[in-house]
Amino acid sequence: MIQAGLRIDVDTFRGTRDGVPRLLDLLDEAGLKATFFFSVGPDNMGRHLWRLARPAFFWKMLRSRAASLYGWDILLAGTAWPGKPIGRELGPLMRRTQAAGHEVGLHAWDHHAWQTHVGVWSAQQLGEQIRRGSDCLADILGQPVRCSAAAGWRADGRVVEAKQPFGFRYNSDCRGRGAFRPRLADGSPGIPQVPVNLPTFDEVVGPGLPREAYNDFILERFAAGRDNVYTIHAEVEGLLLAPAFRELLRRAERRGIRFRPLGELLPDDPRSLPLAELVRGRLAGREGWLGVRQP
């Protein structure tokens, strides 16, 4: 049996409204549980269109055929009008996810703002963004939030420090192999991190890898004897690619791959996890910096 953590990022209003119910049905059909990370504040994701001036982002959007993949309502959200408040309007879907037995955590208050400004925010601004998101999701769920995942994996040592006071059991803020405890500025261990170590659909699909070949590509990258942490998006696998994701789950089962929530990958005693740094780095297929485990 190959153990794998399944992380589902929910970035937008439409992804929550339309993608999450479809994914809940698919996971129920497969008898699987996962971790859902919700964005709960305003949906301003369409403001990323200004990044088209950057060649790397333009190429990524072109390579993944973003307009057909996401739809124009997602690509334009929050541009000419205020972004819809995701948590306020769609909180019942977050409670439904929790009631179905899935792990639920915080992705962001404002996904676009986090990806765009996290690198320059002050410690106070970082804390305020986390607090707003955590308080909103806790009110929706009726219980404290126990885990989080930085939007776009935009995290570094400052983000690690900012999350310390919130009582999360773990965070999934970076890319890399194997759960670890990030080293804080004073040298002490921080809240455990569960990194993602498998590529996402939008990072690899393009001229060299057609959509139809993606399931073959990704299934070959799961391996026994290590943490496999895989991320999908409600806006992709919960919408246009839902049939392909359903087939991926079927094929994964035949290969002995068993998906589970990320929290179940942690040892009973987190003190047994190694210490490592969480630093800024680069990853093929992504535009800009993101958090990576080092070493």
From Swiss-Prot:
Its EC number is 3.5.1.n3. One of its GO terms (cellular component) is membrane. It comes from the Bacteria. Pathway: Glycolipid biosynthesis; 4-amino-4-deoxy-alpha-L-arabinose undecaprenyl phosphate biosynthesis; 4-amino-4-deoxy-alpha-L-arabinose undecaprenyl phosphate from UDP-4-deoxy-4-formamido-beta-L-arabinose and undecaprenyl phosphate: step 2/2; Bacterial outer membrane biogenesis; lipopolysaccharide biosynthesis. Pfam families: Polysacc_deac_1 (PF01522). Residues 2-260 form the NodB homology domain. GO terms for biological process: 4-amino-4-deoxy-alpha-L-arabinopyranosyl undecaprenyl phosphate biosynthetic process; lipid A biosynthetic process; lipopolysaccharide biosynthetic process; response to antibiotic. It catalyses: 4-deoxy-4-formamido-alpha-L-arabinopyranosyl di-trans,octa-cis-undecaprenyl phosphate + H2O = 4-amino-4-deoxy-alpha-L-arabinopyranosyl di-trans,octa-cis-undecaprenyl phosphate + formate. GO terms for molecular function: hydrolase activity, acting on carbon-nitrogen (but not peptide) bonds, in linear amides. Keywords: Antibiotic resistance, Hydrolase, Lipid A biosynthesis, Lipid biosynthesis, Lipid metabolism, Lipopolysaccharide biosynthesis. Belongs to the polysaccharide deacetylase family. ArnD deformylase subfamily. Catalyzes the deformylation of 4-deoxy-4-formamido-L-arabinose-phosphoundecaprenol to 4-amino-4-deoxy-L-arabinose-phosphoundecaprenol. The modified arabinose is attached to lipid A and is required for resistance to polymyxin and cationic antimicrobial peptides. HAMAP family: ArnD. This is Probable 4-deoxy-4-formamido-L-arabinose-phosphoundecaprenol deformylase ArnD. It comes from Pseudomonas aeruginosa (strain UCBPP-PA14). The gene is arnD.
